[in-house]
Design a protein with these regions (language model features):
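A short, structured N-terminal alpha-helical element that caps or precedes a catalytic domain
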Residues: 1-102
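Canonical Radical SAM [4Fe-4S] cluster-binding loop centered on the CxxxCxxC motif
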Residues: 165-179
Length: 179
């Protein structure tokens, strides 16, 4: 069982999905109690976001990360703050477990949506690659795959007037660990 001590609950689902990638099948507690393997904690401060992993009641320095690039004005941007928290948790969990996930810290979103949005905004493929590598720590293979699929999707959607017409969305589960 893993303890979740999260200062702002709006990030709990994102953190739990990331933990599920590294520790499938684990259960979670929202309080300090005996019998937990370890705790994960987020702290949103005035000048930084911190994430910690607590083991045996102590928070070793090796499992604490802070990102001071996230200033208070940026904390109002939920998406940017979430990405910083998830990236820091991913780095800590990868170091702790020795595992790396091919999609990096990406959970709960269709990866091609990120690439497609940027292609539609006129971004170059190399800029999308850099963004996905820096923001989500995704592998080169998965970044290439998402850009390739997004380019195909863009080509299919360009001749359609999908903004004023009708769309049919068929949801197909992508990741069995979160669906």
């Amino acid at each position: 069982m893993i303890g979740l001590l999260i200062q702002d609950n709006q990030y709990e689902q994102d953190i739990r999905e990331l933990l599920m990638s590294f520790y499938p099948g684990e259960t979670y507690a929202h309080e300090v109690k005996d019998g937990l393997g370890f705790y994960v904690e987020t702290r949103l401060g005035d000048s930084a976001v911190s994430v910690l992993i607590w083991e045996n009641g102590a928070a070793p320095e090796g499992w604490k990360l802070s990102d001071s690039r996230t200033r208070p004005s940026d904390l109002s941007d939920h998406s940017a703050t979430k990405n910083v928290i998830k990236k820091m948790f991913y780095l800590m969990l990868a170091a702790r477990t020795g595992k790396e996930m091919p999609w990096g810290s990406l959970t709960g979103i269709r990866p091609t949506k990120i690439a497609l949005t940027r292609l539609e905004e006129g971004w170059k493929e190399e800029d999308i690659r850099s963004f996905m590598k820096e923001t989500y720590l995704a592998s080169d293979d998965k970044i290439d795959l998402s850009i390739e699929i997004a380019a195909r999707e863009k080509k299919l959607l360009e001749p359609l007037d999908y903004e004023r017409g009708y769309s049919l969305y068929v949801g197909i589960p992508f990741c069995p660990t979160t669906c």
